[in-house]
Structures are given as structure tokens and as C-alpha cells.
Amino acid sequence: EDGIRDQPRSRGLGDVYKRQLYDTCQKFDNIEFLNEWYITSIVHDGKQFCGITAIETLSGSFYTIKGKALIIATGGAGRIFSYSTYALSSTPDGLDMAYRAGMALKDMEFVQFHPTGILPSGILITEGARGEGGYLLNKDGDRFMKNYAAGKMELAPRDIVSRSIMTEINEGRGFKHETGEDCMKLDLRHLGDEKIKAKLGGIREISIKFSGIDPADEPIDIRPVCHYMMGGIH
């Protein structure tokens, strides 16, 4: 539960969608997968789509592929930010390719930042950590969200929490991560080892694997990370 929902969500829904789509496509003989290919441009005659140019990354060979229709599903451009929950492949190249072909881009200024990305990787620590009662702390040990959203505290909407964290950092109340980056602390210790393992086992595993921190023993280093881009091809 967080500040903008009154019912808890299930985790891993995106992975279920991807698996179902992939499994369904595998059932059709007329769908060909070109894995590890990189599209470089859209080919058109000024009026209609004609095909694409692409590189097979394993061989470095360049190809032109004819086509009658194109669906661009390259995702957002989250990797333009230093800290992002996006996959390394989520660069703006798909958007750039469409723009160079004359397509309009829309609402590109609307970017959502998730308040709790783990340092140094930027991997997401979900709202579940705060939904179960986790605290956000500045270097003075204060639950600083009381100064920005006293009614919701850590369960305030993402944009409010993200801005609050950056305000604390910019005003000198942040921690210094070993990488030199400024951050805040997400403290789960008061929840107890048993609850953390039962309710937040996935978060604990991520924290141990990617930061070397067991949240049952010490707070997690976090900062806002690019999480979602509302804009795209119009």
C-alpha cells in the first residue's frame, strides 16, 4: 500500500506479460525472431513505410529489410539518466529513429522518478518497503517526510517523495555514498528480521546482492531514479 492506492498490488506483473507474449508468439510459424539485431533507421519514400536498416550485432553485418508495416516498441529513453531502473538497452534510439523519419514526439518532458533506487546500480526498491512501514531518514536521523507530506509521510506519491529527497540532498542533509554520490537512507530495521524475510524477502535479496547491505541489519542507501517516461511517438 502507498499514498495513492488503498489496495496492495501484486509484484512481477510485467514479467508475466512478457512471458505470455513471448510464449504466444512462439506458437506461430510466420513470426520470425531476429535476436541481437539493432535497427538503425526507418526507410520510407516520404509517403509510406518501406522497411528498415539494421545491424546483426554478433556478426556486424548490415542489412536492409523490406516491410509493409512497422510497430515501434523500443520503450522509453531512461538510460539518458545516470540513475535509472531501465534496462541497459533502453536508450533513446527508437525515439530518435522515429523522429528522423519525420514522426512527431509528444509529452517528452514528463518523466517519472521513483524515489527509492538502490545505490550504486539504480535498481528499484519497491514501494512495498515503505508500505510495510519503512522510514526515510536524512543524515540527522530525521524522518524528513514530515516536513513535506505530514499526512502521508513515506507513503506520499512518488513525485512528492522524490522531490523531497532531492530537496534534502540539495540543502546538505544527505549522506555520502562510497561512490561519492549523495543519498538518503531507507531504514527497515525496526520491522524486525522475521517480517523483513516474510514480507520483503525480494527487497532484502536485491539489497544484499547489489549493495552488500542486509536491511535487517543496516539502512539501505537510496536516491531518486528515472523510472517511467510518459511521452513517446505521437
Protein language model features and the residues they cover:
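A glycine-rich dinucleotide-binding beta-alpha-beta segment and adjacent secondary-structure elements
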Residues: 33-35, 40-49, 53-55, 202-234
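An anion/pyrophosphate-binding glycine-rich loop and adjacent beta-alpha core
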Residues: 97, 103-227
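A conserved beta-strand/loop element that lines the FAD pocket in flavoprotein oxidoreductases
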Residues: 28-39, 105-108
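Single conserved hydrophobic/aromatic residue that forms the stacking wall/gate
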Residues: 1-17
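Core beta-strand elements of the Rossmann-like FAD/NAD(P) dinucleotide-binding domain
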Residues: 60-69
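N-terminal Rossmann-like dinucleotide/flavin-binding domain of flavoprotein oxidoreductases
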Residues: 14-31
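Extended, hydrophobic alpha-helical segments in both membrane/secreted and soluble proteins
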Residues: 70, 90-97, 234
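Flavin (primarily FAD) binding-site architecture
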Residues: 74-84
